[in-house]
């Protein structure tokens, strides 16, 4: 059925737009919330009388979109991602990634309005995306993807498992063994001498 929107409805249209929607959607959602009215000669006449007012609101939106476009295109966005030595990312930069970055910069833009040229980004470097703002106004933003280098933690001595002893450690062990053998030989020799003297 045809309806006229009383105000802007997300994903549907703007105030004054005539839309063809399912009857259930109109009766169960739009009409109870006063978001739309049935399209007939009376409602058409009413919105015709408000045409200038509605057009003034749209003109203000166009102006806001132009200002937002300028701000977005002046941005310098840097995204750090885990990557290999050849610059290939271990993951990918998606529209969700850009949406999160814009949120951090206090830009409240719907994710569905962001479009990455090439769908996703899987390498470091400078890339571009389109942000659809209002009507035919879009912003082209550039963003740089850089490799995120993980810091190596120093390995503690207690964490070194299965480590082969150093040469100086090996020499020390051999020296201790030789000294122990020498002491044992001296003790045996002394015991033999005592036994002979008793005989």
UniProtKB/Swiss-Prot annotation:
InterPro entries: Ribosomal_bL9 (IPR000244), Ribosomal_bL9/RNase_H1_N (IPR009027), Ribosomal_bL9_bac/chp (IPR020594), Ribosomal_bL9_C (IPR020069), Ribosomal_bL9_C_sf (IPR036791), Ribosomal_bL9_N (IPR020070), Ribosomal_bL9_N_sf (IPR036935). It comes from the Bacteria. Keywords: Ribonucleoprotein, Ribosomal protein, RNA-binding, rRNA-binding. This is Large ribosomal subunit protein bL9. Residues 153-199 are annotated as: Disordered. One of its GO terms (molecular function) is rRNA binding. It holds the Pfam family Ribosomal_L9_C. PANTHER family: 50S RIBOSOMAL PROTEIN L9. It comes from Treponema denticola (strain ATCC 35405 / DSM 14222 / CIP 103919 / JCM 8153 / KCTC 15104). Binds to the 23S rRNA. One of its GO terms (cellular component) is ribosome. The keyword Cytoplasm does not apply. The keyword Transferase does not apply. Signal peptide: none annotated. The gene is rplI.
């Amino acid at each position: 059925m045809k309806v006229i929107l009383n105000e802007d409805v997300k994903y549907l249209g703007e105030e004054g737009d005539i839309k063809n929607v399912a009857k259930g959607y109109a009766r169960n959602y739009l009409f109870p919330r006063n978001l739309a009215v049935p399209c007939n000669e009376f409602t058409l006449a009413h919105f015709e009388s408000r045409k200038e007012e509605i057009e003034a609101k749209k003109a203000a939106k166009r102006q806001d979109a132009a200002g937002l476009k300028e701000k977005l295109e002046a941005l310098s966005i840097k995204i750090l991602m885990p990557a290999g030595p050849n610059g290939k990312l271990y993951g990918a930069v998606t529209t969700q990634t850009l949406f999160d970055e814009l949120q951090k910069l206090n830009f409240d833009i719907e994710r569905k309005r962001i479009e990455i040229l090439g769908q996703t980004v899987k390498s470091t470097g400078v890339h571009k995306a389109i942000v659809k703002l209002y009507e035919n106004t879009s912003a082209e933003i550039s963003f740089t993807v850089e490799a995120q280098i993980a810091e190596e933690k120093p390995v503690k001595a207690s964490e070194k498992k299965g480590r082969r002893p150093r040469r100086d450690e090996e020499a020390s062990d051999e020296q201790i063994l030789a000294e122990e053998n020498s002491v044992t030989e001296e003790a045996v020799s002394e015991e033999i001498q005592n036994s002979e003297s008793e005989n």
